[in-house]
């Protein structure tokens, strides 16, 4: 077991969840913008791009939800362990925290790529 600053771990979890919530709101709005773009006359070759973006928004919104829930459960686990183990965490819990951070960074990179791809699509269709 390792003595750890719970406020730092909880703070990181809160930050990750807040950022994921912001991405969720952004991509929900982007789905609406995409539907509005489809309402305009688009060349047939753009419909494949629309379908790709719709699929990506759907998949990434699911990924955001799943990771947010995993972080929330981890944060609860950290708090429970700290209370029941006199302020100490199991090594596995710290490893889980690091793994969640890696997952968060990977998802954030994917989300930024999707944001860039979508903005490029909007520029090409307007």
Predicted regions and their residues:
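Charge-rich amphipathic alpha-helical interaction elements
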Residues: 1-126
